[in-house]
Amino acid sequence: MNIFKQLTIVWTMSLIFWTTLSHAQIDKQGNQLPVAQELIIRPYVQYHTPGEATLYWKTDVPGPSIIEYGSATSERKRVKDAKPKTDHSVNLTGLDEDTVYLYSVTTESKGKATTSADYSFDTTFNYTVKPIDTSLNPYESIKGYAQAAEKILRETGITEGYCLVYAAGRGQLAFELAKRSELIVLGVDDDMKAIGEGRQILSKAGLYGDRITLMHSKSLDATPFTANYANLIVSDRALNAEQVPGTSNEVLRVLRPNGGVAYISGTAESLKDWVSLNADSFTIAKGKKSYWAKSVKAALPNAGSWSHQYGNTTNNSNSGDTLGGAGKTNEMRVQWLGRPGADFGIDRNPRMPAPLSMNGRLFHQGLNRVCGLDMYNGAMLWMLEVPGLRRVNIPRDAANWCLDEDSVYMAIEGNCWSVDSQTGSLDHLYQLPEKAKRDTHEWGLMMQEDERIFGSTVIKGGSYTTYWGKEAWYDQREGTGTFKVCSDSLFSITKNKTEADWTYKNGLIVNATVTIADNKIYFVETRNDIAKAIKTGRVEVPEIWLDQYLVALDANTGELLWEQAIDTEDGIVVFYLTYANDMLLITSSLRPKYHLYGFSAKDGTQKWHSSHDWVSDNHGSHMIHPAVTGETVFLEPMGYSVATGEKLRDDLGRREGCATVAATSNALIYRGENRRVAMWDIEEAEVTSWMNLRPSCWLSVVPSGGMILAPEGGGGCSCGNWVETSLGFLPDFSD
């Protein structure tokens, strides 16, 4: 076959199919064009155990599952499951640590083979815990420990995260629990001799220090552990004692909020006495051989959540968290630090989606990867490597994900993935409801409220994904990088259903303005014909600011409630919509000013307009997203009345660097002086900061669950000696 024919086949297949063939495959297949098999989901990777990776993908018609993979220094291996299916999974074993693997997917249909382009995964990000050989038993006698461990895991349902064995003795219960679960187990006891013997036994078996650690404490009444961290607390010595060691006060202090479980064995009388100071927090039940006291810790008081890009569906950048009254960094303490690090992400500049947090969990996006963590101790719950996940320049778009109590919803190419927030498993797939758009459009904004998810359609290539080069700093005041991503339809789907409840189509919807409150969905759209004719998904013509309407729909039915023609200053730099206290606030940034507008959420009538100069025209000072606390909307450096637009204050503490603002009831969190992560106490107007800690260039530090969460987002910065690790902070008086 001549080279011209080979190139023709390559070019044709690249256009028609979801695949690009290698030279070897072209030589093998000759003139035969394969029958296309569409990938509904491109292959993605999840790690379940060290040294292994499972690849998943979905096709439109059944076929075998075939993977070819290898590292840069190894020959490719081929794995095939011949059973035809549409939901594919292949488990790869024997993988090296800290290694990038390339892989491709081959499908066969009617005797023809189609091979995808190369994808990659990096085992550096296999954060799974090392399993313990179940045949091991370094202890001389079992004494019912195995049965106790099995009962504890079965009755509590806690099998991962951190376990504290309170009064751990020689560590036998700690060993049995670790062997049967993915728990990282810490044992503590005031008996130094028992701790020493346990360390020797576990060290001799090669088990000490990885999954199991034993510590000595002078008193079990005051152990050397931070509060609110342990997913599971049990007791070794209580299994075989007439009196339960220590105090229930200390156990409850250390127990993780929002679902942490204490499960302590003893006699009926000993447990009744032990829980007496906290009787309302425990239940006591009879088992086969003993009684068990159980406590499930509630959420911290007045703890909020961060379920959407700017906190919630109102886009008010406020989690509703009180942080126990804390308004300064010196009123917070480090709760945990660790993974992921800077290598997990892209860089601080491209302005990626914010981390999200809800129901005791934290979620963070990196370079085509996403992970779930326990927000109170940093334990890694799961990690996915997902081609097509990446979205950047969020100030000019909507984020690609949101949360509810149990699921993470991610807009990935033309689909919405519903992922179990505890396990990372893909539970449900939503496709664009208009089948005719699935070849030309992608899923745009991603929001959820109650029983519905909300999405939009954006022309393919509309969302920003470029993260390399000067233009990818996205700090521009005009031109490339400031063009707004817009959707040509908006829709709602009931969770776990497939068909849309309703679809709205009229003008071009500015993604960054879509807001939901009180069962209504609000947005700004342009109905200008020139703007609507743009077929890139990013509207780069000035006509986007003409023929604009503020629109309100019934979120349940899609019924038009009202629409109002508006004429604001052009939002060349950024353009946002926020709901607060029956008002809709439009933020528009145009050199050299911010413009803030107040509209009635009842009918869209304009109530007020205020403006002020930018603090500067670079490093994010010209593109801040507003934050609302109480009756005040803050937009650097001002605070305005939500109701009237009256300037209430102009003393917002100095902000430096490219990051926007997150709010609690008592403080604003942003990048303060010397470019550190800072808190501005709203009442005292005082700024405090953490040394050597910086955020990303948009939003990577959020308050949630009674904490401040800072998954690493500042990697790549050269303007300081920064700590490039993830951290969680808890109020220092939360004990």
Per-region residue spans from a language model:
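Conserved class I S-adenosyl-L-methionine
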Residues: 158-175, 182-186
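Short, surface-exposed linear motifs at loops/turns and structural transition points
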Residues: 25-131
